[in-house]
């Protein structure tokens, strides 16, 4: 960080983080990345469940570390009067309280939204749960796969002749985490005008449903749920994964101009004037035969040749990379998307803001109650 750079736009912000597992900690990690002081309040015992999740490096859980590095850790038993008083003092000074318990848990602990407002009228109280704090499913337990199953996203993921599959990453958790971050940021901005706090209520179900895009559009337009399409796009073609002589590549043509350029690169210019392929709508209708024409040509040479040739004419094209290959890309390095936190390689901050530091090294994830003595002393009165 240079002398002219800040730690981030949230430098000086105090966040009390009661979130656990993935959904909530992902959202508060974004706040931490942007300069906020995040104090993770963990229960007695083993703390956040993910401390016990693999994989491990040097005895540390990577699962926990990926979404909790740079945060402080204190263990508080909120059923204990002394610990509860420390927690209340923390709340009095905090800007944000984040949690992802089932609805009703904070009330049982004595910290309803009404009580929190009395303690600190400017507090942003952010809740994230499977189905939110309202509606008939609000008390239902949820993990990522439950939400993927119920939101419709699993039913539209995969191939038409195969069963539905879970999206490869924990999409519902991560969608919820991103919206948790966005909700907190929005509420903080609103506080600048109102001078009062707010309750942010995020549901993983809502978040995932809002990401459905094609699925929702198709249903609204036709009254029917869409079929699974594999790697194809419902409204654009060619927009798929194609086999070459040695490796698959992905090609995306979103308009007639790109399709014409692709045909030029593949020396298939006769396809441009073929009435079956003269528009996106027609190419989608006839994409099976179109894919045969394209793959027949692609299979004559190696992927490397086609990647260069197609890229040269300005058509979006890419190899299918493994994680190991993706993290070694010069682009990954140039964007500082791999950093070191506590001696362990971690994902970098995807939010780049001018004038704010984008460090290559961050503090690692704290051990359980690592900052307990310091925090108890700081907030003892």
Swiss-Prot record:
Keywords: Transferase. Induction: By the acid response regulator EvgA. It catalyses: oxalate + acetyl-CoA = oxalyl-CoA + acetate. Its EC number is 2.8.3.19. It comes from the Bacteria. Coiled coil: none annotated. GO terms for molecular function: acetyl-CoA:oxalate CoA-transferase; CoA-transferase activity; protein homodimerization activity. InterPro entries: CoA-transferase_III_domain, CoA-Trfase_fam_III, CoA-Trfase_III_dom3_sf, CoA-Trfase_III_dom_1_sf. The active site is at 233. Homodimer. Belongs to the CoA-transferase III family. PANTHER family: SUCCINATE--HYDROXYMETHYLGLUTARATE COA-TRANSFERASE. Involved in the catabolism of oxalate and in the adapatation to low pH. ACOCT serves to prime the oxalate-induced acid tolerance response (ATR) cycle by producing substrate for oxalyl-CoA decarboxylase (OXC) and formyl-coenzyme A transferase (FCOCT). Catalyzes the reversible conversion of acetyl-CoA and oxalate to oxalyl-CoA and acetate. It can also use formyl-CoA and oxalate to produce oxalyl-CoA and formate with significantly reduced specific activity. This is Acetyl-CoA:oxalate CoA-transferase.
